[in-house]
Amino acid sequence: MQPQRNLLLIGLLLVSFMLWQSWMVDKAPKTATPATAESSVPASSGGDVPNQNDASNAKHALLTLRSDVLELTVDTLGGDIVEAKLLKQTEAQGSDKPFVLLEKKPQRQYIAQSGLIGRDGVDNQAERPVYTANGTEFALVEGKDELVVPMTFTDAKGNVFTKRFVLKRESYAVGVDYQVKNVSAQPLEIQFYGQLKQTIAAPEGSSTPGMMASAFHGAAYSSAEQRYEKVNFSDIGETKLDVATQAGWAGMLQHYFVTAWTGKADAQNHIYGKAVSVNADVKDSGEAIIGIKLPLTTIAANSEAVVGTSLWIGPKLQDQMAAVAQHLDLTVDYGYLWFIAQPLFQLLQFLHGLVGNWGVAIILITMIVRGVMYPLSKAQYTSMAKMRLLQPKLTALRERLGDDRQKMSQAMMELYKEEKVNPLGGCFPLLIQMPIFIALYWTLMESVELRHAPFALWLTDLSVKDPYYVLPLLMGATMWYIQKMSPTTVTDPMQQKVMQFMPIVFTFMFLWFPSGLTLYWVVSNIVTIIQQTLIFRQLEKKGLHSRKK
């Protein structure tokens, strides 16, 4: 019946909102445990290294590496990436400034570090190496698909360590490796590590405006046992993450963007996490670190070896990330209904390829989904109509049997069987539609392709709310009309008032929803109105519906 339908619609939205809260925002931050200024350089597999700071009195310089999609700033002290600009992602809608993913500022930092530890590693307890490079600015030239930038350091024994950054055209995957030349008479033992370090306190503007919950901002990793696991920054110090795995990756997430170091596919790697410089008296103080260590490498005397891996710095582009590391594409977090959301996204992407507009693609996918669900909707309204016709008989049963619930239930089941009516027929189609709506919700919320994607007129960004609230008002108006045209048997005055206020409540809630999602709901309501009109006309011919309420 209509009351159940409305209540289920309310439940649908509440479930989607709760899933949003639980999936994107994990439990509240815990009080950080006290810690001293712990070393950023990880312990090698051979043992701990004493505390040290990243700072050094040695002179160092900043290098600029530029491809067609990335602009990196590399500090010759340690060879850390201290800034990363995504050249094809703008800072804001209408802005020509590229989005800055990695940065190092006095108030906060988010950087990608890498080095060599182990017995003969150059990143040790005393200081990190200062590399030299042939220039300070390097760019991918026209006609070339790859940019290789080497930096060199020679230790006290004369061993040469060449750290290389490899940037490829149209790729957010950066190769980072070391070419080590051992000129000594003894073997060298080194271990590559790559890690990300970020201030625990969330950056300004990281929360979604309005009533929507913030996107997940924290660490994540993948191992042989855990395909995809998220770790809150506030918990990373207590978690004491130490996972041995083949392949795998360790990264940090920021809604549409991810940075991740990948492991060696055919060897045992170690994923680790910790918090440094934590002050127990200051909430969210210190820095979170997550990284991956490759296996120990032994370089024979008077020989050379290469050790390294790749680093993803960019938007969550599923196909490209899947090619870089297994399960890295799972950072596009569609929640528990990923098996529905994934094909929906592929369909949405296909439609966008045909029409070239994400808003039009949303309209088309809504019509397709509603078209597929039409037989279920027809079955739902037919069942509701039959149940409505049974109301006089059900009322007579209640009057005749009184409070005898057992006899009442038995008599009702016999009546349903005799009249060939399924009492759950009106609910079942809605239960099927619910996961589809929630999955589409996640698809629209998690897909970076919709970031700053325009539709038409005033809708210049489908990933944010409608600036003039036109779509939420249309959604409320169409919902009110659906309610008005649908027959109801509600006689209780309180229930009638609740039903009347539902369009207002939904309108208010959708004021802060992304305009892409609201567009879906408006189009869905319009299609529902058309479908209901057709279904009611068919039911009228069968004597199951009357336009008079």
Curated annotation (Swiss-Prot):
Its main location: membrane. The chain crosses the membrane at residues 6-26, 349-369, 424-444, 462-482, 503-523. Keywords: Cell inner membrane, Cell membrane, Chaperone, Membrane, Protein transport, Transmembrane, Transmembrane helix, Transport. GO terms for cellular component: plasma membrane. It comes from the Bacteria. It is a multi-pass membrane protein. It is found in: Cell inner membrane. Residues 35-55 are annotated as: Disordered. It holds the Pfam family 60KD_IMP. GO terms for biological process: protein insertion into membrane; protein transport. GO terms for molecular function: membrane insertase activity. CDD domains: 5TM_YidC_Alb3 (cd20070), EcYidC-like_peri (cd19961). Required for the insertion and/or proper folding and/or complex formation of integral membrane proteins into the membrane. Involved in integration of membrane proteins that insert both dependently and independently of the Sec translocase complex, as well as at least some lipoproteins. Aids folding of multispanning membrane proteins. Interacts with the Sec translocase complex via SecD. Specifically interacts with transmembrane segments of nascent integral membrane proteins during membrane integration. Belongs to the OXA1/ALB3/YidC family. Type 1 subfamily. HAMAP family: YidC_type1. This is Membrane protein insertase YidC. It comes from Tolumonas auensis (strain DSM 9187 / NBRC 110442 / TA 4).
